[in-house]
Amino acid sequence: MARRYCFTLNYATEIERETFLSLFSQDELNYFVVGDETATTGQKHLQGFVSFKNKIRLGGLKKKFGNRAHWEIARGSDSQNRDYCCKETLISEIGIPVMKGSNKRKTMEIYEEDPEEMQLKDPDTALRCKAKKLKEEYCSCYDFQKLRPWQIELHAALMAEPDDRSIIWVYGSDGGEGKTSFAKELIRYGWFYTAGGKTQDVLYMYAQDPERNIAFDVPRCSSEMMNYQAMEMLKNRVFASTKYRPVDLCIRKLVHLIVFANVAPDPTRISEDRLVIINC
């Protein structure tokens, strides 16, 4: 199983040649190049190199492209293979050949080419790449349903500019009102989503991108351990994240902060004038 292959296809007619080439989908390729050659015997053939986004077995290649082409796992660099394929006539080229030692390749591209290799060499980076990929897939497929009355009220509140004090508290004691569904929908718009937790854990995660709007989606089981401290620190836009990589953050940009909860806020632990309460 590999991503990079060389192939040769002997053909007799233009239709046969074009039919084979039409089987390559640009969405599946990192890089693709193919040239047209004529052997000393007069036999016309395609000489190509392809770098797929995902690994594929030889059996998979034959299933997709048929049995007539000859396939081999590629050796050498993309550029070396390109030179070999273009000795006579270049027919098609998709993408840019990757140079060994080039810094142009993004970390995500390297991860997608071989996740297992990155996991062995740099597990922390691999974990972050996987999380980013999963989030992108989640955001692209999540389908929100028709808004309920309280969700329309919340949406209207979010259309206003955020201030430096208000915390929007969405409260519904029964459950099943759509609080978590709305909170998850906000992820698609770049919001920071958290279920709460220890103050420094929350601050550390938020500090990775400290200009995001914030959604606390508090599980019912955590209602008695509501972290008002973290909520106020994030809303105040000045805090210290001391976990792993200590940093003091002073942020000018104001953000919305929403708490989705099964309980009403405790007035002994947070100033009532901060609160904008929306009942489900």
From Swiss-Prot:
Gene Ontology molecular function terms on file: ATP binding; ATP hydrolysis activity; DNA binding; endonuclease activity; metal ion binding; nucleotidyltransferase activity; RNA binding; RNA helicase activity
TM helices/strands, residue ranges: none
EC assignment: 2.7.7.-, 3.1.21.-, 3.6.1.-
Motif (Nuclear localization signal): 54-75, 97-103
Keyword set, alphabetical order: ATP-binding, Covalent protein-DNA linkage, DNA replication, DNA-binding, Endonuclease, Helicase, Host nucleus, Hydrolase, Metal-binding, Multifunctional enzyme, Nuclease, Nucleotide-binding, Nucleotidyltransferase, Transferase
Reactions accelerated catalytically: ATP + H2O = ADP + phosphate + H(+)
Cofactor binding: number and manner: Divalent metal cations, possibly Mg(2+) or Mn(2+).
Domain CRESS-DNA virus Rep endonuclease: 1-97
Binding site for ATP: 172-180
Localization of this protein: Host nucleus
InterPro entries linked: CRESS_DNA_REP, Helicase_SF3_ssDNA/RNA_vir
Motif, RCR-2: chain positions: 45-47
Primary site of residence: host cell
Cellular component GO terms held in the UniProt record: host cell nucleus
Positions of short motif RCR-1: 6-9
Extra facts: The genome of nanoviruses is composed of six to eight segments. In addition, some isolates contain subviral DNAs.
Subunit structure: Homooligomer (Potential). Rep binds to repeated DNA motifs (iterons).
Function: Initiates and terminates the replication only of its own subviral DNA molecule. The closed circular ssDNA genome is first converted to a superhelical dsDNA. Rep binds a specific hairpin at the genome origin of replication. Introduces an endonucleolytic nick within the intergenic region of the genome, thereby initiating the rolling circle replication (RCR). Following cleavage, binds covalently to the 5'-phosphate of DNA as a tyrosyl ester. The cleavage gives rise to a free 3'-OH that serves as a primer for the cellular DNA polymerase.
Domain notes: There are 3 rolling circle replication (RCR) motifs. RCR-2 is probably involved in metal coordination. RCR-3 is required for phosphodiester bond cleavage for initiation of RCR.
Family label: Belongs to the nanoviridea/circoviridae replication-associated protein family.
Name under which the protein is recorded: Para-Rep C2
Source organism: Subterranean clover stunt C2 alphasatellite
The organism's taxonomic lineage, starting at the top: Viruses, Viruses incertae sedis, Alphasatellitidae, Nanoalphasatellitinae
Gene: C2
